[in-house]
Amino acid sequence: MSTLINGTSLGNLLIVTGSFILLLLLVKKFAWSQLAAIFKAREEKIAKDIDDAENSRQNAQVLENKRQVELNQAKDEAAQIIDNAKETGKAQESKIITEAHEEAGRLKDKANQDIATSKAEALSSVKADVADLSVLLAEKIMAKNLDKTAQGDLIDSYLDKLGDA
């Protein structure tokens, strides 16, 4: 009985081994090329995806660098615009101050001329009034033949009138 078991086991082993080898030969003949093609296609797809991802990363890096350069240029341009505006403002400030000083000088000169004209007119008017009063005083003195005290009082009276005028 033990030879039967050993013989059966050996027979089973030979049948299973033969079946396995036959299966491998059939798979190699009919399916191996298709399986290899599937694995090759999968490998190529994964490699392509990795390359695409690397290219996308590089493009993103280039784009980021370009955006950073543009941002820096925009900042520099904004700073330049601000500096130009400050310079323009200072120039306008200086111009306005200069014009204001010139206008103040013109107004001062005109006021001085007006004052001089008014003074000249006032002096002319006073001279005319003094001349008229002097003539009037002389006429009264001649007409009245006054003593020295009366003449002094009369002159003081006319001078007071002149001071009021």
Swiss-Prot record:
CC annotations in GO: plasma membrane; proton-transporting ATP synthase complex
CDD domains associated with the record: ATP-synt_Fo_b (cd06503)
GO molecular function annotation: proton-transporting ATP synthase activity, rotational mechanism; proton-transporting ATPase activity, rotational mechanism
Residues that span the membrane, as ranges: 7-27
Chief subcellular location: membrane
UniProt cross-references to InterPro entries, sorted A to Z: ATP_synth_B-like_membr_sf (IPR028987), ATP_synth_b/b'su_bac/chlpt (IPR002146), ATP_synth_F0_bsu_bac (IPR005864), ATP_synthase_B_chain (IPR050059)
Keywords: ATP synthesis, Cell membrane, CF(0), Hydrogen ion transport, Ion transport, Membrane, Transmembrane, Transmembrane helix, Transport
Keyword Transport (UniProt): yes
Membrane topology field: Single-pass membrane protein
Entry-linked Gene3D superfamilies: 6.10.250.1580
Subcellular location: Cell membrane
NCBIfam families the record matches: ATP_synt_b
Assembly with partners or alone: F-type ATPases have 2 components, F(1) - the catalytic core - and F(0) - the membrane proton channel. F(1) has five subunits: alpha(3), beta(3), gamma(1), delta(1), epsilon(1). F(0) has three main subunits: a(1), b(2) and c(10-14). The alpha and beta chains form an alternating ring which encloses part of the gamma chain. F(1) is attached to F(0) by a central stalk formed by the gamma and epsilon chains, while a peripheral stalk is formed by the delta and b chains.
Protein's job: F(1)F(0) ATP synthase produces ATP from ADP in the presence of a proton or sodium gradient. F-type ATPases consist of two structural domains, F(1) containing the extramembraneous catalytic core and F(0) containing the membrane proton channel, linked together by a central stalk and a peripheral stalk. During catalysis, ATP synthesis in the catalytic domain of F(1) is coupled via a rotary mechanism of the central stalk subunits to proton translocation.
Family of this protein: Belongs to the ATPase B chain family.
Protein name, as recorded: ATP synthase subunit b
Naturally occurring in which organism (per UniProt): Streptococcus mutans serotype c (strain ATCC 700610 / UA159)
